[in-house]
Amino acid sequence: MFVARKISPNCKPGVRGKHTLPKLPYDYAALEPIICREIMELHHQKHHQTYVNNLNAAEEQLEEAKSKSDTTKLIQLAPALRFNGGGHINHTIFWQNLSPNKTQPSDDLKKAIESQWKSLEEFKKELTTLTVAVQGSGWGWLGFNKKSGKLQLAALPNQDPLEASTGLIPLFGIDVWEHAYYLQYKNVRPSYVEAIWDIANWDDISCRFQEAKKLGC
């Protein structure tokens, strides 16, 4: 049901595998001093794992409700599927969007950014401002608009998944739930968002951009 799950090409139609917590492509301490080890462990092992567990539970209930043609239950499950499914999708992208290694946008992505925001720094400033301004918990996103063929920024509340909510293909997401930064940055969200650019994985973001363009009109 959700893109975060890897499905074997040999799987039979209708056979649902359980979602699992993805392994990080780096050590928990690898993103220090930008994000400390304690935050990474809690964020990955506790918060993301909870989304995975709750998504699996909701999907099991969904299958049962479908088998019983229980329309009321199907409707009741929609918020849990959106919240936990979104949490799983968003975090799976988030881990890959970060890297302890210094990277740069591909020439193609840099050109696209500069054509819309004049410079990479202006783009960073606009996404930072948008993300910091999220009320409560949520995410700031760089996405790709398949219809226009252009990059687009968006801010979404809670764990709302970008593509399901807006149609934009997610390229880079910034998590501004307090569990992502509070132990280290306290209530100074701007400092966290500004610092995260130092660990942005432009290799991953650039790759997502290339793949997204293939889906455009």
From Swiss-Prot:
GO terms for cellular component: mitochondrial matrix; mitochondrion. Its main location: mitochondrion. Coiled coil: none annotated. It is found in: Mitochondrion matrix. One of its GO terms (biological process) is determination of adult lifespan. The keyword Transit peptide applies. InterPro entries: Fe/Mn_Superoxide_Dismutase, Mn/Fe_SOD, Mn/Fe_SOD_BS, Mn/Fe_SOD_C, Mn/Fe_SOD_N, Mn/Fe_SOD_N_sf, SOD_C_sf. Mn(2+) binds at residues 43, 91, 175, 179. It catalyses: 2 superoxide + 2 H(+) = H2O2 + O2. Its EC number is 1.15.1.1. It comes from the Eukaryota. GO terms for molecular function: antioxidant activity; manganese ion binding; superoxide dismutase activity. SUPFAM superfamilies: Fe,Mn superoxide dismutase (SOD), C-terminal domain (SSF54719), Fe,Mn superoxide dismutase (SOD), N-terminal domain (SSF46609). Binds 1 Mn(2+) ion per subunit. Its cofactor is Mn(2+). Belongs to the iron/manganese superoxide dismutase family. Destroys superoxide anion radicals which are normally produced within the cells and which are toxic to biological systems. PANTHER family: SUPEROXIDE DISMUTASE 2, SUPEROXIDE DISMUTASE [MN], MITOCHONDRIAL. Homotetramer. This is Superoxide dismutase [Mn], mitochondrial. It comes from Drosophila melanogaster.
